[in-house]
Design a protein with these regions (language model features):
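Bacterial N-terminal signal peptides that target proteins for export
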Residues: 1-10
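Catalytic glycan-binding domains that act on GlcNAc-containing polysaccharides
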Residues: 23-188
Length: 188
């Protein structure tokens, strides 16, 4: 029931979407952006979560268009719905450290936008949470757990963002076209 509702919403929303910027499985030319792709590849090897699923996830979470290409960004933070893309790791860590010291816990971190409130305790410190490889491996393990034995990556991607069906469906309306543009077709 939930799956059929999500798929119906995806069809409607996908029909309304404008063309996506160019995407590349090989990753962006920018060295920082390439860190998320490299981390996704390593996490895929370690966990068995399909590489294209992880690339689509990082692009959905942190993707921004630069030079006509959608690229992920490892130094991205989202605090209470406000996205910030910092130029480098040090700037992002300074902002993150200050926000956490001020009592903010609803902040999404790094390539896969792991929420500090829900996942921060899994990391030794904020630097580890921001690290592209550690961020990717944690996200991939979470996706593996959410997909379960069914390996339903569509449902896992929706649940990765939210367990609320309508919120997950809106997220999937962005995720699925990105995945398809990578050459993966629709996730099943």
């Amino acid at each position: 029931m939930i799956r059929s509702r999500m798929l119906a919403l995806l069809v409607v929303l996908a029909a309304q979407m404008v063309a996506l910027p160019a995407l590349s499985r090989d990753g962006p030319a920018d060295a920082s952006a390439a860190l998320c792709i490299k981390a996704a590849k390593e996490a895929s090897r370690e966990t068995g979560v399909p590489f294209d699923v992880l690339v689509a996830l990082t692009l959905t979470e942190t993707g921004r268009t630069r030079n006509g290409q959608l690229e992920p960004w490892p130094w991205a933070l989202n605090e209470g719905g406000k996205s910030n893309w910092f130029a480098d790791r040090d700037q992002a860590l300074t902002y993150l450290s200050d926000a956490v010291a001020a009592g903010t816990s609803n902040i999404d971190v790094g390539c896969f936008q792991l929420n500090y409130r829900w996942h921060g305790a899994a990391f030794a410190d904020l630097q580890a949470m921001m690290d592209p490889k550690a961020n990717a491996i944690y996200a991939a393990r979470l996706m593996r757990r959410l997909a379960g034995d069914s390996e339903d990556w569509l449902l896992a991607a929706g649940a990765y963002h939210s367990s609320t069906p309508d919120v997950a469906a809106r997220y999937l309306a962005r995720f699925d076209p990105i995945y398809a543009a990578l050459g993966g077709g629709q996730v099943t």
